[in-house]
């Protein structure tokens, strides 16, 4: 979406339910006078793992007809180096206390303190502890998946993958993957996985396996995987 920070010109923001806070780059923070207050620890996909970042406050954030004041934010300072693109801005509606509906087919985004219930083909119980998760199964084993509108694929953690038994053995295909904490040198593609979310099935599905130990440690529970655009864009 396009958003204005402190009344400045519009910039692109990723709507990111996989982020604990709204995030701005060092460049935008300096340009729009978002002052850092203190440092905190953040964690994401990538070999950096736990990462020290600044916390600041956006006086006003405008997205379409929505205007929010006094928005806590993470400032990506120091910035990551060695990744293909610069770190982008992202807006976390859940951290702002908002409900959100993303209609991928109609390309429509709805925010609100309360959003009326609508008929649904499938409902998944949602849990929120810093991030929002749903329960799923990986080869019939229970796992918690982060709902990440800012992510691209369906992935599972390396710890979850290590508990799966394969007969015969399945070849692992190395991948080049980076996230909010840099490159993940151990990422690989694992074919032949059976995923289930209530009645939503992904049989014999290739998943990306990521090192999620740092996010799990910071959150205080084992993150089993992440569901991103590949999953969510069907709805």
Give residue ranges: language-model regions.
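Pepsin/retropepsin-fold aspartyl endopeptidases
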Residues: 1-235
